[in-house]
Swiss-Prot record:
Places the protein is found: Secreted
Chief place of localization: secreted
Protein name: Snaclec 8
Organism: Echis carinatus sochureki (Saw-scaled viper)
Functional summary from the UniProt entry: Interferes with one step of hemostasis (modulation of platelet aggregation, or coagulation cascade, for example).
A molecular function (GO) term: toxin activity
Organism lineage string: Eukaryota, Metazoa, Chordata, Craniata, Vertebrata
Coiled coil segments of this chain: none
Quaternary structure annotation from Swiss-Prot or TrEMBL: Heterodimer; disulfide-linked.
Length: 148
């Protein structure tokens, strides 16, 4: 019986998705393929905006990772578990001045919502613009059984 590792998405390891690859097409060297997308983890410390910018500079069409089902999320976690230090990564889900309407940086449809039901978003209007504060917690607890 092995122990379980719990991973939630938030802050440390930068991970990217390169969409639009066709079946049978190889990903760039150092990238891993899954369901017509290519993925790569980078151990770079940066804020979310810089992480997205860094990602778009890696390869044409690349963005921070977007997740569309539990199988894809499991694939991502298995690829990054060896480099995780604090168990958290940046992902492409954002709400930049969009008043709690979340979206992926790659423009993909938000079809897989795995955040905590207790997540909340508060909008305070100021004279100039809305001030948005939120506590969004991605709630998918990935359980990877370690050998031993």
């Amino acid at each position: 019986m092995g122990r379980f590792i719990f991973v939630s998405f938030s802050l440390l390891v930068v991970f990217f998705s390169l969409s639009g690859t066709e079946a049978g097409v190889c990903c760039p060297l150092g990238w891993s393929g899954y369901d017509q997308n290519c993925y790569k983890a980078f151990e770079e410390l940066m804020n979310w905006a810089d992480a997205e910018k860094f990602c778009t500079q890696q390869h044409k069409g690349s963005h921070l990772v977007s997740l569309h089902n539990i199988a894809e999320a499991d694939f991502v976690v298995k690829k990054i578990v060896s480099v995780l230090k604090d168990g958290v990564i940046w992902m492409g889900l954002n709400d930049v001045w969009n008043e709690c309407n979340w979206g992926w940086t790659d423009g993909a449809q938000l079809d897989y919502k795995a955040w905590n039901v207790e997540s909340n978003c508060f909008i305070f209007k100021t004279a100039d613009k809305p001030l948005v504060t939120y506590g969004l917690q991605w709630d998918t607890q990935f359980r990877l059984q370690e050998p031993g």
